[in-house]
């Protein structure tokens, strides 16, 4: 058995090279079929994301990592000398540990990010669909998913916001007890606001207002998250309805001023409002923070929160790494015990084959009228000689080669030193 991982990722390779060896859906189907039909690879899974391409496999006896690397280079028509400097290789327990670290987000560009686990699960499902994975590799991935779940349960590695969009939503959850009962106004409709909307939706927010310069872009978000749409000039009219305002536009001048917020507060009878301004330059006048019942956070405030949370994730990662080390060692113990089970089964089958062969000869001898006592004595002698032949030769060879430790193991194995 030889477990192997070969791959490149965001730390070892440039974007250009990662793009060259990425597997599109069509390429993945062809690649998995090639792995399945390979004479050198027993079982394999291909993980391909924007940040990494990795092949997890069990190779047959005598096959080295070079075979898999050559296959990857040839498949993508990439020169081997271009690929090799960026390749990393993990074998046996190191391969097991690497997969577990990847799935737990410990090897990600953003430490602890949860999306990678879904990508690993998809890679495994694809390999299964094409009958490319079985045996040890299949068991490895199943164990890996349990380890990732344990890490998420026993540590808080994914619990601290490390993106601006998620940090903004985390602030909202901290200040307002229930987002399901809060109205959120999103100013802008770009990628960051779309991420904010997704996080808010996941957190249970049901009342969203999207304010944007162009209605068409705002409608895309509105359809996706069941939101109301207004134009930027309509913000003063609707601002009082919002408990939380998160803004990210490309406007060169502030969109929301102190006077506008004062008016909204009066209409709300001074119920608190949270403003999160993640635009550069600012969408919300800094003087808004001077008002009572207003919480105003800028992108710099969020950055300090994110920096703190990254440090917290690093602390949580220490415990996660300990879990991965423990679980990878446990998986290797399972592999060794599996190998022992196979050896025991083969030993029993060989012994049973000898027994049946000699028994049949004895039955034939008895049927031909030979003396029963003589037949039984011959059976017992031959059975004893055949069963002790292999360990006898092994002890003689160990003694001849000056291998006392090996001789001691054999003696213990056959019960001489128990």
From Swiss-Prot:
Alphabetized UniProt keyword annotations: NADP, Oxidoreductase, Porphyrin biosynthesis
Molecular function in Gene Ontology: glutamyl-tRNA reductase activity; NADP binding
Phosphoprotein found in the keyword field: no
Residue positions binding NADP(+): 188-193
Catalytic activity: (S)-4-amino-5-oxopentanoate + tRNA(Glu) + NADP(+) = L-glutamyl-tRNA(Glu) + NADPH + H(+)
An annotated GO BP: protoporphyrinogen IX biosynthetic process from glutamate
Active site: 50 (nucleophile)
Pathway terms, separated by semicolons: Porphyrin-containing compound metabolism; protoporphyrin-IX biosynthesis; 5-aminolevulinate from L-glutamyl-tRNA(Glu): step 1/2
Site entry (Important for activity), positions: 98
EC number per UniProt: 1.2.1.70
InterPro entries reported for this sequence: 4pyrrol_synth_GluRdtase (IPR000343), 4pyrrol_synth_GluRdtase_dimer (IPR015896), 4pyrrol_synth_GluRdtase_N (IPR015895), GluRdtase_CS (IPR018214), GluRdtase_dimer_dom_sf (IPR036453), GluRdtase_N_sf (IPR036343), NAD(P)-bd_dom_sf (IPR036291), Shikm_DH/Glu-tRNA_Rdtase (IPR006151)
Coiled coil: none
Pfam families for this protein: GlutR_dimer, GlutR_N, Shikimate_DH
Binding site for substrate: 49-52, 108, 113-115, 119
PROSITE patterns, alphabetized: GLUTR (PS00747)
Miscellaneous field: During catalysis, the active site Cys acts as a nucleophile attacking the alpha-carbonyl group of tRNA-bound glutamate with the formation of a thioester intermediate between enzyme and glutamate, and the concomitant release of tRNA(Glu). The thioester intermediate is finally reduced by direct hydride transfer from NADPH, to form the product GSA.
Self-association and partners: Homodimer.
Family: Belongs to the glutamyl-tRNA reductase family.
Function statement: Catalyzes the NADPH-dependent reduction of glutamyl-tRNA(Glu) to glutamate 1-semialdehyde (GSA).
Domain notes: Possesses an unusual extended V-shaped dimeric structure with each monomer consisting of three distinct domains arranged along a curved 'spinal' alpha-helix. The N-terminal catalytic domain specifically recognizes the glutamate moiety of the substrate. The second domain is the NADPH-binding domain, and the third C-terminal domain is responsible for dimerization.
Cited PANTHER family: GLUTAMYL-TRNA REDUCTASE
Protein name: Glutamyl-tRNA reductase
Organism: Aliivibrio salmonicida (strain LFI1238)
Gene symbol of the encoding locus: hemA
């Amino acid at each position: 058995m030889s477990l192997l991982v070969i791959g490149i990722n965001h730390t070892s390779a440039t974007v250009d090279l990662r793009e060259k060896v990425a597997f599109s859906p069509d390429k993945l189907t062809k690649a998995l079929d090639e792995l399945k039909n390979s004479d050198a690879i027993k079982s394999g899974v291909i993980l391909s994301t924007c940040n990494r391409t990795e092949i997890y496999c069990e190779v047959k006896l005598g096959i080295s990592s070079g075979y898999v690397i050559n296959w990857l280079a040839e498949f993508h028509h990439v020169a081997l000398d271009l690929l090799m400097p960026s390749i990393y290789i993990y074998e046996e327990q190191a391969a097991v540990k690497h997969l577990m670290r990847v799935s737990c987000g410990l090897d990600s560009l953003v430490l602890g990010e949860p999306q990678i686990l879904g990508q690993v699960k998809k890679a495994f499902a694809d390999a299964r669909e094409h009958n490319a994975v079985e045996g040890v590799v299949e068991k490895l991935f199943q164990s890996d998913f349990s380890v990732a779940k344990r890490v998420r349960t026993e540590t808080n590695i994914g619990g601290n916001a490390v993106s601006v969009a998620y940090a903004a939503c985390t602030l909202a959850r901290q200040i307002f007890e229930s987002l399901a009962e809060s109205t959120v106004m999103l100013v802008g409709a770009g990628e960051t606001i779309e991420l904010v909307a997704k996080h808010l939706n996941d957190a249970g927010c049901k009342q969203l207002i999207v304010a944007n310069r162009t209605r068409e872009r705002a409608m895309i978000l509105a359809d996706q998250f069941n939101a109301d749409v207004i134009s930027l000039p309509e913000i003063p009219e609707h601002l009082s309805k919002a408990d939380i305002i998160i803004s990210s536009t490309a406007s060169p001048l502030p969109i929301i001023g102190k006077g506008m917020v004062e008016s909204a507060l009066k209409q709300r009878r001074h119920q608190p409002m949270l403003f999160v301004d993640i635009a550069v330059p600012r969408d919300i006048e800094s003087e808004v923070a001077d008002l009572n019942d207003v919480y105003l956070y800028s992108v710099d405030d969020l950055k300090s929160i994110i920096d703190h949370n990254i440090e917290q994730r690093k602390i949580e990662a220490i415990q996660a790494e300990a879990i991965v080390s423990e679980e990878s060692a446990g998986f290797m113990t399972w592999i060794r015990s599996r190998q022992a089970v196979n050896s025991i089964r083969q030993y029993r089958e060989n012994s049973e084959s000898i027994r049946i062969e000699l028994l049949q000869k004895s039955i034939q001898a008895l049927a031909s009228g030979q003396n029963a006592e003589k037949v039984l004595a011959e059976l017992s002698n031959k059975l004893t000689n055949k069963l002790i032949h292999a360990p006898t030769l092994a002890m003689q060879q160990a003694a001849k080669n000056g291998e006392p430790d090996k001789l001691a193991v054999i003696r213990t194995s056959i019960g001489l030193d128990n």
